[in-house]
Curated annotation (Swiss-Prot):
It is found in: Cytoplasm. Belongs to the RimP family. This is Ribosome maturation factor RimP. The keyword Cytoplasm applies. The gene is rimP. It holds the Pfam family RimP_N.
Length: 145
């Protein structure tokens, strides 16, 4: 159920050096295009500091300049943060959210616990009563709480 983040995305490759230098993770990029223009939505996160409105406004200006110089179509740009109950959508988000509390569905019920450690194909999930190694392919749903 959990998909793999596409690092071959053109927008990702244009901004990854900038966000990396700022200690900001790119969680998700959505690109919507029609004949004349498009919309680019980017979800960002930082473990080290809060991404407040002033920071996002400044970052928006820089990313917009980078994308306008390189993309051959018109677009609008939206930057946002993940929110407190974000669905975890890719395997790499388990690494990004290590130490965070999540609700996890493996069978048909949600269970609350923490992401202790993320590995290449799995992660350690800790509840009040157990620690278990969970393969990403076994995850039906996961979200932050």
């Amino acid at each position: 159920m959990i998909k793999y983040f596409d690092k071959n995305n053109e927008v990702f490759n244009l901004i990854k050096d900038l966000t990396g230098r700022l200690n900001v993770e790119i969680l998700e990029i959505n690109i919507f295009r029609n004949k004349n223009n498009g919309k680019i939505q980017i979800v960002l996160y930082s473990k080290n500091f809060s991404l407040d409105i002033d920071f996002l406004t400044d970052l928006h200006k820089i990313i917009l300049l980078i994308l306008e110089a390189n993309l051959k179509y018109g677009f609008t740009l939206e930057l946002s943060t993940p929110g407190i109950d974000r669905k975890i959508k890719s395997d790499r988000e388990f690494k990004i959210f290590e130490g965070k509390k999540i609700k996890l569905m493996l069978d048909n019920e949600f269970e609350e616990g923490f992401i202790l450690e993320s590995k290449p194909k799995s992660f350690i999930f800790k509840t009040d009563s157990k620690e278990v190694n969970v393969f990403y392919s076994d995850v039906k749903k996961a979200r932050l709480v």
